[in-house]
Amino acid sequence: MEQYNVKLHRRAVQDLDGIYTYIAQTLMEAETALKLIDRLEDAIFSLETLPYRCPERRTGSYACRGYRQLLIENYTIIFQIDEARRQVLVVTVRYSSRA
């Protein structure tokens, strides 16, 4: 089974940083923040194999434009697949109420 190269758009990196900062500094739960970021990163890099297992995005931002989504806890990871380059580009990671 061929693998895909997973890349994070600058926005996705900023989203992950923001999630960590909010939980660690605002909620004062640094350990919880680290564990959540680990789970989100594990999910993101699981897209190296079988990224088509995730459904196309049908509602909200990025809907019906070829983007796919992966739901992890209360977060939505939104990404595109570039088949020619065998690449998955994660464009954003959003709290589900905003996704």
Language model segments and positions:
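Enriched for short, Lys/Arg-rich terminal
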Residues: 27, 68-99
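Basic, Lys/Arg-enriched alpha-helical interface segments
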Residues: 1-66
